[in-house]
Amino acid sequence: MSAYKRKRGSLPEVATNTKKAKKQLAGSEQEATAGEEFIVPPPVSEGKWKNKERVLIFSSRGINFRTRHLMQDLRSLMPHSRAETKMDRKDKLFVVNEVCEMKNCNKCIYFEAKKKQDLYMWLSNSPEGPSAKFLVQNIHTLAELKMSGNCLKGSRPILSFDPAFDREPQYALLKELLTQIFGTPRYHPRSQPFVDHIFTFSIADNRIWFRNYQIIEEDAALVEIGPRFVLNLIKIFKGSFGGPTLYENPHYQSPNMHRRMIRLATAAKVKEKQQVKEVQKLKKEEDRPVIPVDPTEAVFYTPAEEKPQVIETEPPAPKPKMKRKDKQFKRQRMAKKRM
């Protein structure tokens, strides 16, 4: 804009304020607004995260797809877990304690695969111990079961243990170890502040059976979610992944011995069948009881004339060939007939 020029002899114009004046509230309204305060609701988790349990879940190389899916299911159900790459078979088990220290974890679930068909699970309190070694059997993953139950990811579970865990000392030790590993710490940053599922550990046939159920709000019924697996205890060690043996399961049978027993049972069945066949063959070859001759059978018997026995000392003479060499084809013979 061009500058405004004032005319000669005229008074200067008073500057006008273009902004609108704010409406001033009355005294009573000002006091009412001053008394009102905007209150921000507090967070859902008012407590402090004190239990710093962290569980490292990983495996060795050579596991199959079912074990990998089970490992992923456990990671999704345990918000306080951490993952790690697979460990080489050449490395010894003491290396796991160093991995836990680097990952800032004080508990560990380690899956060890052997012969591409046997799966072992280590539950350890790193680095002091104790640790337990299990044989994992009857694995069923979440994707495989397709149960109707469901739970929110990150929610805290209720741990339910069989009463048999309090009767024997080795099971009491395992109960405390399982509680510290599978129990989600309260006020954990990744956890949800409510409970909607339950982990059950029951003892049957000298094994620990794991199940996961959803708690329905309406009638407090239980609906299974998954996964499923069975833990067959092998040994409990004083240290982490080694050390003096505190307990050894007398009922444990190694997978190699189990497969050997199956092969021996199959071989015994085959051998038994062969022996039965030989006995039946011997019975057939034995002399049968002599039946007395019936005299009426030879009534109509007529003896045949005895023919002299001829022994040929020379080969027979060759027969003459009657085949015509000048035999024409059928087509030529038919052509001659037409002519």
Swiss-Prot record:
Alphabetized GO MF terms: RNA binding; rRNA binding
Gene Ontology biological process: ribosomal large subunit assembly; rRNA processing
Gene3D superfamilies: Probable brix-domain ribosomal biogenesis protein (3.40.50.10480)
Residues annotated as domain Brix: 53-242
Coiled coil: none
Tissue specificity annotation: Ubiquitous.
Record InterPro entries: Brix (IPR007109), BRX1 (IPR026532)
GO cellular-component term (any): nucleolus
Keywords carried by this UniProt record: Nucleus, Ribosome biogenesis
Region (Disordered): 1-34, 304-339
Biased composition (Basic residues): 320-339
Pfam families assigned to the protein according to its UniProt record, in alphabetical order: Brix (PF04427)
Chief site of localization: nucleus
Compartment(s): Nucleus, Nucleolus
Endpoints of the signal sequence: none
UniProt family annotation: Belongs to the BRX1 family.
Protein's job: Required for biogenesis of the 60S ribosomal subunit.
Entries under PANTHER family matching the protein: RIBOSOME BIOGENESIS PROTEIN BRIX (PTHR13634), RIBOSOME BIOGENESIS PROTEIN BRX1 HOMOLOG (PTHR13634:SF0)
Name of this chain's protein: Ribosome biogenesis protein BRX1 homolog
Record organism: Xenopus laevis
